[in-house]
Amino acid sequence: MDRTKSKSSGFLTLSAGALGVVYGDIGTSPLYTVREIFGGAYAIQLTQENILGALSLIFWALFIIVAVKYVVFVMHADNHGEGGIMALTALALRQRHRRKHRAWIISLGLFGTALFYGDGMITPAISVLGAMEGLGIATAALSHYVVPASILILLALFLIQRRGTERVGRLFGPIMLLWFLSIGTLGFVSLRQTPEVLAALNPLHGFRFLTAHQGLGFAALGAVVLAVTGAEALYADMGHFGKAPIRVTWFAVVFPSLILNYLGQGALLIRNPEAVQNPFYLLVPEWALYPMIGLATAATVIASQAVISGAFSLTHQAIQLDYLPRQRMVHTSESERGQIYAPAVNRLLLISVLALVLAFGSSSRLASAYGLAVVGTMVVTTLLALVVAHDTWRWPGLALLVTGAVLLSVDLSFLTANLAKLGDGGWIPLSLGLILATVMSTWKKGRDVLFARLQQESESLSRFLQRLTDEPPPFRPVGTAIFLTARNLSLPFALLRNYEHNQVIHQRVILLTMTTLDKPYAAEKEKITIEALEHNFFRITTRFGFMERPNVLRMLNLCRHAGLHIDLEQTTFFLGRETLIRSAERGLNRWEEVLFISMFRNAYNPTGYFKLPVDRVVELGTVIAI
């Protein structure tokens, strides 16, 4: 009985957490979606048939994209319980060994990842602006304070990131539950006054809407997609909460509340077309307007926090999988391993978000830029999930064809509609995606070229050990020397240089390789492998998941449990410090060389990244031409 109660309590806790983190973005979309369809740059004439058609498209977009695609299909593609586009890319690569196939999958994954960063810049700006615009509905005199108030809120949000959000995070679930109950109730009250709006659930209304307006109706899809922004979070945060809590909260709370609110806004527009200036806030009774603005502000801050945390987590994954240079990462919670703060990413997001708020000034103007980032990520997710369905799940060809045709037809329709908004701001996330994808691919390519150069100039471990047998070093100091080495280098460059210049080999030498697996967390039994070699050399391989932080001191404890005792006071860590210069040899293009060398110089030092004791580290420099 107690076990059942404990399981129920744990499930409810996870469900509340999912409400607070996963659904913040999609839950605040009613603030601007309907208004954008009928009052935005591609506004549709306000007639009852058009209102029913637009609401029908919103309902079926939520059902097909979120309920069917993400909740049923994509969430099945978990990488040992973890989700997100980097995890999906690693999963899609697992069965692909041809270089050309891997290159395409990596390019897709990197572009989708880059678009997610674009989403991370736009979500806080559009969400907080959308909430603050309620001030103009309350009284026209306050409309001038929308942008300044938004900037203050966003500044506070980004400045508290360094302290972590563990404490206030406990309030996210209850606040979002209150938000969903409130918007659902507001919609239901309006719906009861105009029940004929329920006809919008018939997909024929959506079809007629598109065919009747042709080009303009198709362009309106670019606004309809705003209703599904944040759908990617269902998959990205799966590792934190699990599939069941996310699925249950979607069908039990989020989906009904969203549909009720959208139908309620449509009912209001049928009764009062002038409400198009802000149908969300005009649903609210006058006495409840200020409390609702406060609740909406809290909900949009929570939505922004979820995206910011997602950007930190994605950066950590990209570094571990070697798609980005090392950066300083701070774990802000001792109990929650997913609580990460990336100072450089936080600064970049803050500057970008404030620039967007100042440049666009309203959620309506930002909506054009928003849709393209969201849909681009969705298309990439669909393609990668289809690769997994083919390679890993072994789906039959017909099932794969039908699923791909349905999902891609929806995704590509929304993508095409949003491409029409390139000139209105859609170029921002697209340009950002191309730039970031180029940065990540250049880093990956540059690292491969660098390791190839090191391998050329290095010596095989077996030959080096034979050299020690033939010509023993004149002096072997007491203690342990640990040399960090890449997975594809048999002999660390620092060891070779140290021996050539100093003719010194310590009494015990450990060659340490840290490998990142294509899954989030390494099992205890595979975390460490110890191999004894000649001349008191040891090769140690430690394995980490892409959600874990490499920690050398923790590795020393694992060695102790495995029977190899290492006294830290008698241990020196030798690191290679490579200085890169441009080479005449072909490997990277000239612009790639400049970019890679710049990133390499500015990467966070390995001493801090791997948590090495600074008083036990020796760096040996060398010049490498790439």
From Swiss-Prot:
This is Probable potassium transport system protein Kup. It is a multi-pass membrane protein. Belongs to the HAK/KUP transporter (TC 2.A.72) family. The chain crosses the membrane at residues 11-31, 55-75, 103-123, 140-160, 171-191, 216-236, 250-270, 282-302, 340-360, 369-389, 395-415, 422-442. Transport of potassium into the cell. Likely operates as a K(+):H(+) symporter. InterPro entries: K+_transporter, K_trans_C, K_trans_N, Kup. It comes from Methylococcus capsulatus (strain ATCC 33009 / NCIMB 11132 / Bath). It is found in: Cell inner membrane. GO terms for cellular component: plasma membrane. Pfam families: K_trans, K_trans_C. It catalyses: K(+)(in) + H(+)(in) = K(+)(out) + H(+)(out). Keywords: Cell inner membrane, Cell membrane, Ion transport, Membrane, Potassium, Potassium transport, Symport, Transmembrane, Transmembrane helix, Transport. HAMAP family: Kup (MF_01522). One of its GO terms (molecular function) is symporter activity.
